[in-house]
């Protein structure tokens, strides 16, 4: 079954590459929307979640304006704590939501179906930590520095891999969180 899925994926990528070769890299629509899976670390816990982002390329150039929203969720197991302290919680639930926007620089390869980009985004992040019915929340300034690459299947669709460093200041404590995201890009508008 895995071999069939992998074979189908390889055929799709090869067919998409051939169809992309018929359109130039500078002929892409100016708006792209990205949605996908995202993994981040937070408070020494791995968090899984989602990410949605949009970018508008000014005059279909290398410069764009990007906004993104993401949510990450997870639990930290404290299995030894209830043994040491009876009645203590056995896990801590974490959630992290980000709302950021800022400039994005994109390089479109003239020879390959690949776009590489970098961005520096600013905004706010919201964290919630809860255990045994008690919770605490904080909203703080955040910034995101990172980038990624799109593999263009055709003029409208692409697959994206993205790696970011998310910096937050929750509970008066500055922390940097690595974040990796994988998903699909859909492009809107008419190429300029």
Walk through the language-model features, giving the residues of each.
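Bacterial N-terminal signal peptides
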Residues: 7-17
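Short glycine/proline- and aromatic-enriched beta-strand/turn motifs that initiate or cap beta-hairpins
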Residues: 21-59, 122, 181, 185-192
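Outer-membrane beta-barrel domain signature
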Residues: 22-24, 39-45, 88-94, 132-137, ...
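Residues that define the transmembrane beta-barrel architecture of outer-membrane proteins
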Residues: 29, 46-50, 93-99, 114, ...
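Membrane-spanning beta-strand positions in outer-membrane beta-barrel proteins
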Residues: 32, 62-64, 115, 152, ...
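Transmembrane beta-barrel strands of outer-membrane/channel proteins
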Residues: 33-39, 67-71, 118-124, 147-149, ...
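Predominantly the C-terminal beta-signal and adjacent terminal strand-loop region
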Residues: 77-78, 151-192
């Amino acid at each position: 079954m895995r071999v069939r899925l992998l074979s189908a994926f390889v055929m799709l990528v090869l067919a998409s590459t051939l169809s992309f070769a018929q359109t130039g890299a500078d002929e892409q629509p100016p708006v792209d929307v990205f949605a996908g899976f995202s993994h981040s670390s937070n408070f020494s816990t791995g968090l899984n979640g989602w990410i949605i982002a949009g970018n508008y390329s000014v005059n279909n150039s290398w410069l764009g304006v990007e906004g993104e929203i993401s949510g990450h969720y997870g639990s930290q197991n404290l299995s030894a704590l209830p043994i040491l302290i009876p009645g203590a919680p056995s896990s801590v639930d974490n959630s992290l939501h980000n709302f950021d926007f800022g400039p994005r620089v994109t390089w479109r390869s003239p020879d390959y179906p690949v776009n590489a980009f970098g961005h520096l985004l600013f905004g706010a992040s919201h964290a919630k930590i809860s255990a045994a019915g008690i919770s605490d929340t904080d909203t703080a300034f955040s910034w995101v520095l990172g980038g990624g690459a799109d593999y263009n299947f055709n003029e409208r669709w692409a697959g994206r891999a993205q790696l970011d460093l998310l910096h937050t200041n929750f509970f008066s404590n500055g922390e940097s969180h690595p974040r990796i995201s994988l998903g699909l890009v859909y492009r809107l508008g008419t190429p300029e």
